[in-house]
Amino acid sequence: ELWPRYADERYFLSKSNKDFVDRNLFITIRDKETTCIKPYQKDLDLPHGLALDVLPLDYYPKNPAERKKQVRWALIYSLFCAQTVPEKHGAIMKWGSRILLGLTPKPLRYRIWKKAEKEMTKYGLAESDGITELCSGPGYMRNKYPIASFEDNLFLPFEGTEMPIPVGYDAYLSTAFGVYMTPPPADKQVPHHDAIIADMDKSYTEYKGEYGA
């Protein structure tokens, strides 16, 4: 409700719903005056500007059985919300996902993903002993971060301004990325996200006809 009232029209908030699926698991905010066309979205009619990912954090239940349930629901959510076949997580997951999506009509996919979302996010502070990421893929889904890392924030300089970061940023980054202050070897310094076209000076509208949509 707040976005249409207060946001700059230059930016587009994208979130999948019953009638629109952008193949992400989370909200993205896109700059309509730039271009960053992802391979998995090239056939979609949406603003293909540079995206800022808004990744949610959820509580990590302390009960091991509940944690296993949470992960199962998160995997179900991932499949039916993105509605794409995962290509990088093994043949079993790839073909199992393809079969499940093929057997499930689109209206039912939405109902399944909303049920899964409700179940995986139902845990609160009292029944949890950590924080996790359920919308960043199976790898990050395994991570457990200290609750205290996100109980406050601090402001640090960033490109001429100051931005808030979690007070426990070091614990988070170390868990997620290892020795994050040391650059990886040269052969590992490659992008992890593909783009068909990337242009920070021109709007995606100038590239109409050069990609799938």
Where are these regions (language model features)?
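Short, His- and charge-rich active-site/binding loops that engage polyanionic ligands
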Residues: 71-74
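A short secondary-structure junction signal
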Residues: 64-69
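Conserved catalytic core of two-metal-ion nucleotidyltransferases
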Residues: 2-62, 81-90, 98-177, 183-213
